[in-house]
Structure formats: structure tokens, C-alpha cells
Amino acid sequence: VVSDTLTLDEDCSYSVYVEDVNRNFSSARVNLYLDVTKYNVELTDGMPAATSKTFLCLETGRTFYVANIANDPKGIDLGFTYYEGNDNKACLVSLDEYYKTGNYAMVVNDLNPEVIFKDATDLVMFDEVDKASDLKDIFDQAKDYPTVLDYTAGKIAPALEEEDMIAFRTEDGRYGVMKVKEIDRKNEDTSNNQTISLDVVVEKN
């Protein structure tokens, strides 16, 4: 009889030993898997002088890509930019509309995967999210972001601050939440290299 209740925050594997009435022992391997994965990622400007406004994941080296390659190899494709003409309003942008930032003369490309963003700030605590059904519920309850510039509704999470919570849905139908852990903004100091740190929880592939 097993009476312990386990609360998981990561995938686990256990060996269970069983004794029968004749005191014979056998063992079994028990694998316990979450239906979400959690990780932290930092996006950093790719130019030494922090002038490119192209933010990339140092772990994978892929531009516009939020991923923990071991736990979420498919990743979440998005961009990180600032309001045009305003260096203190950080935004996440769906990659299929990133050309609208004005930072790059990108050709409209409907083949780029989309991400839909909603504002989940004050709706949930990041550490309390531990299953996929939570993520869809959070997304459904979250507020729509105001549309800025000529973005399609839901394609930009604007004017981010530290501790903000961003609910999202990927093009392949996975739900997730990102917490803005830290923003190193443009022009805040002379050594600024423009980074954003995100805590991510997302449905597994």
C-alpha cells in the first residue's frame, strides 16, 4: 500500500519495491510526467553595442526564438522589440507580424508561425501553474492587449513591465504563460546590453 502523495514540479522516475505474502521482493519502475514544461530564457541583443533590436536566445542561437532545447525543442517563435521612437516600452511581437516594428524591412510572410498574446497580469501566480488545463483557463480569462500601430489584435504584448504575466497560444495550439522576470531597458545605463528574462510554462508537444 502506497500512502504518499507526490506534488511534482518536474518529470520524475522512481523505483518501487513490492513485498508479497511470502516475503518475495520485486521492483517496478514508475515514470511520472507533467503535461507542461517550465524554464527560464534570456533574450539578448545580438550586437556588441546593443543596437540591432534583434533579440535571440543564447541557449539555441536562434533569432526570435524562446526555447529550452531539452524540454521544449519546438519552441515559441516571437520577437522582442521596443515601441518605435520610445526606448522604454518593451514589447513581445508575433513573428508573423514582426516586420511591422519598422526595425527590419522584412517581407510579409504568412508562413512564419503566429503567437497570440493576452494580458494575464494579476490573474495568476506563475508558481501556481502546473498543468495544461490551467494554461487554457488562464488564456480564456486573460484580457486582450490594446492593439498598437497596425498590428492584428493579439499579435503584440506592449509596454511590458517586470512581473507582468503574458498568456499565449502558439500556432500549433499549445497554451502557455510567460512571466517577465527582468528587463534591462535601452539607455538605462552606459553598459546596457538590452536583455529580457522570461520565466516560461508551456504545454508539452
Predicted regions and their residues:
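Surface-exposed, beta-sheet-biased, low-hydrophobicity segments with strongly acidic/polar composition
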Residues: 1, 5-205
